[in-house]
Amino acid sequence: MDTFKRWLNKPKADDKSLLARFFHADRSLTAVASELDSFDGRAEPDRCTRLVSRLRQNQDKVLAITNLIMEELLGEDRDPRAFRAKFPEEVLQENLAGQLWFGAECLAAGSSIMNRETESKEMRPLAQAVTKSLGNVRVLLRDQCLKNNVPNSKTLHLDLNDSTTEQLYESLKIFDRLFAEFELSYVSAMVQVKSRHEYEMQQWIGVLFSETLQRALKIGLLDQEMVDAFDPGLMFSIPRLAIVAGLVVYAKGPLNMDMPGDQLSEMFRPFRTILIKIRDLLRNLNNQELYQLEKLLCTNEDINTKVPLGSSSIEAPSPEHSSHPTTSSSQNNNNSSNNNHSSSSTNTTSTTTTTAGTTNTHRTVERLVDQRNNNHNSNSNSSTNPTVEAATLRSPSMLSLSATSTPTASPAPSPTPSHSIASTSSAATSSTNPPADWSDGDDEDEDDDDIDVDEEDIESSDDGTDEEQLLKDIVSADCASGYLIPNTNLGNLLQPQEVPLTDNFVASEDDEYGTAEQQGHQGLEEDEPSTSAAMLAATRTLQRLRLPSSDNEPLAEPTTIKASEEHMQQPSGRHRDSHSHRHHQRHHHHHHHRHPHQHQHRQPHPHRTTRSGRKRCSLEAADPERIQPDREQNLASGDTSAASSLSDDVSLAMRNTTARLKFKSTENLLHRLFVCIAGVADQLQTNFASDLRQILRSVFLMNMSTAQEEIDIPEKTKESELFEFRASENDVIQESAGSNQSIYSAEEVNPELDNVFSAGGGNQATGQRHSAGASMQRNNTIDLASQPGEGSPSGATTATSRSHVTRSRSLGDQEAASSATSSTAQLRQLEQQQQQQQLQIQLQRQRNNSVGSNTPSSASSTSSSSEQNSPVSARSGSRRRLQSNNETQMPSSATSTSATLSPPAWIPDGKAPRCMACQTPFTAFRRRHHCRNCGGVFCGVCSNASAPLPKYGLTKAVRVCRDCYVREVRSGMGVQGVQSVQSVQASAS
């Protein structure tokens, strides 16, 4: 009996209820699956492929109907799917559910996703649970289809007291939860799904892009018109400028290269190494050079900078970036010495270059020290040196390079009476080491050859001075590298037990003269550097390195610095392999054939033990033992944090300065930066196109100017500009086939043939069309002759009032003026009735007028006054009256045509994805059509009717939908009957 009931309740094929649709879809899916299992797919691959395609289509249909059933039964109890916001746009497709089901069955059967073996193994238990739960749901739904189906019901009619209904409810909840978990896992394994941190970083990048655009608009790099017009060039300019701004201007933003790599956005994470190099080079640019680089990134114009490298101070802009490029005026003038002691080096240009470089290092550190002192002494006046004032306004990492640092500079006088000096590369190399290793960082085995390109050619010579003169020159200056350690006094600097601080820039006298055997080998063939080029500057710096709290402490009197005597008697077989200057090391490398035994016993840091005993800065005081505790106390003080801070700044200064020295000119540097920055930005366009489009779309919407609706009063146009060209339907179909744009109706093809352009009387059109942009203005003029008073003579000129009805029709906006209200329609109907009565009275008066009357009729009121007064007017009076009689035979039609309403606004194409009548989706071949009566969007089948619309001034047949056609035809028949009766009455009168 139960089987008979099931057979009786079996859904029919034309049943549209949810359960019936599921029953037939599931039955079709089962048939395809059975056929697919009935043969070997490898033997018949074509048939297998065809059946698999049908299988996936049926799976999509079954899951879609199941989803509708869950929406109705579960409602708010459905598992949330907010994670879909993380999915890319291309993933969210209509057949996503079918793909997930197919993937779950493949994983449950033991297959693995290609190149995702680990993820496949983790998802396999979940996939098996999904397929099992879905099979249970299908069985329960089929049972409900045979028991509780109501044919053609829009809702489900289940028995709530039945246990199977409750079981179905719980099974649907379990399946919904499992399917949501599998969807997240499967899509995350196939495509990259952003985390919460990544979304936050992407929002910060959007803010950076917006701030960059506003800054570019402020300094004149871009125009607001480009933003409003969505200029495609901005898609390339904004990311390039954002890289510069994120590295220099907003250095603590999302492009902060100091943060760990895993915290950077995935967009810039692959370019972290090159971005760090770009940042180091950008910090060497001044405001003018930075502006030229940004302009180059926007316009791709040639670089106008022809000045050599270092002609202006090189500084990175502070976060308060100047809105206009200004030439930096922080030129360092060295006024400490007037002596011109020309060195007798064989390479004068190289010597001068290295002299300037070392001097610049001292100047840089002086500025940093002055800044530190100014920060500690808030009540003290700022330094009188303009260079120091400029440095205090900037970040400590924003340093300056003097104008004399160009490799092509001419020989300049030495600022101090000094001998040939060491290269700045030693200081630059030591800057890459920790602050504690400033004195020994030059003895590493690895050499940065690409930085020190021409260092092998730098040699120095001695000017022949004796030992006493050398000692006089280096009094209190042989510890010159001590200025790298801030917040210290001479007691700290002269610590003999600590690592000596004289390796970076200055060589001691034992390096100059060495032992007797070393002098025998090198006496006349090698000249070694003896002193630094900025010893006096270092002496002044030492005075500023003391803490404010230590100013009252008794300062030990500096005396001459001499080497220890016991280390002057070193064995001859032990070479000075701890020399601080790299070019000196390379000098030994060039003479390696003379001393093959000297580099065999090289220690990792041998000078830590040898130089501390062989050479130290000693203080000739009365009681050295009494000063020792003071020095240890000072070293144990809490000044190490400030010392490391300033050491880091100096290290950054050395690295940036040396990096810039690789480039021959500013033009070369800017060109290299342009290539690197443009390369990174263009890679973003390729690798992260979707994210970049989304960010740029938000930036454009945030920064575009507010739209101001300007009402343009059209001027009188020429006859050739009266009409705009509009493409016909054939032109639109032939030229833009495949697009989803609307097809223009037949009325728009030849609008000049419409009667809406003719006036109420006369055979000449008085209405004019004015086009402004994409809109068209139609001015329809109605002449209303006021009824003269009873006492007025018959020949008196009647007063004419004009009522202008303007109708705006737009091709681009597809929006027109709002429809007239019902009160306005009633008022116009009364005006039409009054006008008909006036025309009848006027016709009667024209019949009573004499032939020679000069009073023109209302129909010929458009003629000029010269025509009325001419002799021809008398002879043509009868002809004019005949024309007026013919024109007044249909007064109602003329007035009804001219008194038109505004057409309804068209619904935009983007807001109508389906036909508003049959709900069929539009495609490239199923085009959109607008009804001219209601403004709705319909397909070609639902809008294949055409009818005239006199109320809108459209007397020719235009496209309308079926509903409007039935309504307009019925109303049109009634209006035409009334108009015919009125015309007959007018002709009879």
From Swiss-Prot:
Source domain of life: Eukaryota
Region (Disordered): 308-466, 544-647, 754-905
Zinc finger regions, FYVE-type: 909-969
GO terms, biological process: negative regulation of epidermal growth factor receptor signaling pathway
Composition-biased stretches (Polar residues): 765-784, 794-811
Annotated Low complexity bias: 324-362, 374-385, 395-409, 417-436, 635-647, 816-874, 891-904
Residues annotated with Phosphoserine modification: 549-550, 810
Alphabetical UniProt keywords: Metal-binding, Phosphoprotein, Zinc, Zinc-finger
InterPro entries registered for this protein in UniProt: FYVE_LST2 (IPR043269), LST-2 (IPR051118), Znf_FYVE (IPR000306), Znf_FYVE-rel (IPR017455), Znf_FYVE_PHD (IPR011011), Znf_RING/FYVE/PHD (IPR013083)
Function text: Negative regulator of epidermal growth factor receptor (EGFR) signaling.
Family statement: Belongs to the lst-2 family.
Name the UniProt record assigns to this protein: Lateral signaling target protein 2 homolog
Source species of the chain: Drosophila melanogaster (Fruit fly)
